[in-house]
Amino acid sequence: MAKLTKKQKEAASKIEKNKLYSLKDAAALLKVVASAKFDESVDIAVRLGVDPRKANQMVRGVVTLPHGTGKDVKVLALVTPDKEAEAREAGADHVGLDDYLQKIKDGWTDVDVIITMPAVMGKLGPLGRILGPRGLMPNPKTGTVTMDVAKAVQEVKAGKIDFKVDKTGIVHAGIGKVSFGAEQIVDNAHEIIQTLIKLKPTAAKGTYIKGIHLTSTMSPAIALDPKAV
């Protein structure tokens, strides 16, 4: 395990071991312990009482963060020529179809989100082995396969993110930057937690929200009290 730097040790010393913080206190503390010279990303990890191996306990969805992610999301719109102007006006960074499909086949994946149309999905099938592992495959459930391309692009640019429970039962999501105000971090975290609660599978038994941790790129994790969020 890598040794902690002096700054990381100082940060860790400010977080009480075995203490469960309220969301408000955790957000304020996170801004204190963040020590990197760059604007660190803020992430949340929510451990759910589900068995993701069972289809009826899979948790996935989308949420629009009230204050966005703080990240400049790069969007590729794979659309037919009649939709290109619409996609560009909405703010897509890359717009086209066959040229970009070839670029992806050649290994290019320098985007954060791909938005496409139902008629184009057939062409994307063979690229699943490239896009799937990178979380870039468009999906109707997350609103990235749609005829309303402009709306989809605008929502992603405004802070709409999709999430999915991993095989260990944890949902990870980026919810902002350390430069955000503490209240903005609280609002964004609260939004995703409430969305997860609404998505609780009926097959999930026992405690649903088992644990929540807030962290920044370089800081130790801060444990939250699930009852105080």
Curated annotation (Swiss-Prot):
One Gene Ontology CC term in the entry: large ribosomal subunit
Record keyword Ribonucleoprotein present: yes
Keywords, ordered alphabetically: Repressor, Ribonucleoprotein, Ribosomal protein, RNA-binding, rRNA-binding, Translation regulation, tRNA-binding
Protein family (similarity comment): Belongs to the universal ribosomal protein uL1 family.
Full protein name: Large ribosomal subunit protein uL1
GO MF annotation: an example: rRNA binding
Biological process annotations from GO: regulation of translation; translation
Keyword presence, rRNA-binding: yes
Organism: Flavobacterium johnsoniae (strain ATCC 17061 / DSM 2064 / JCM 8514 / BCRC 14874 / CCUG 350202 / NBRC 14942 / NCIMB 11054 / UW101) (Cytophaga johnsonae)
Subunit relationships: Part of the 50S ribosomal subunit.
Function: Binds directly to 23S rRNA. The L1 stalk is quite mobile in the ribosome, and is involved in E site tRNA release.
